[in-house]
Amino acid sequence: MDITGYTKWQYKTINASILKSIGHQELIYYVEILSPWPVSNRDLVVHLRIEQNSITEITQFHCRGIPDYIPAKEGVSRVPMSRSTWHVEPIANNKLKIEYTMEIDPSGSVPAWLMNKLSAEGPYESFFALKNSILSRNYSKADAPF
């Protein structure tokens, strides 16, 4: 997992780092997300678990927030609850079907107009940037440890 690469494609992510590796298919990481005024930046600590079916090669990334893992950063709102899943399925040579679901409590007061904007814009911008990042950084030859 290229967690530090999140800043290149994950929408509004300004900091990403691995806090702990727990084998080849599990880790804990930290991300900070830039938020527009008047909202303070948000951060998350995430426990990531990866599963892959050896026959179908379908890979699932299960992410769960663990907000108390490290102390909160001053001036940044810690996300108290987050869950997400990436379902990645090979469908043809060099083609993937990716389904992403996320449930999040952003913490604090976030105007509805801003949540609506980010909910619509974030996934689109992230997937667009992810595709470009994969193509430009040539991840097709990457060796996955699972």
Mark where each language-model region is.
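Eukaryotic helix-grip
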Residues: M1-F146
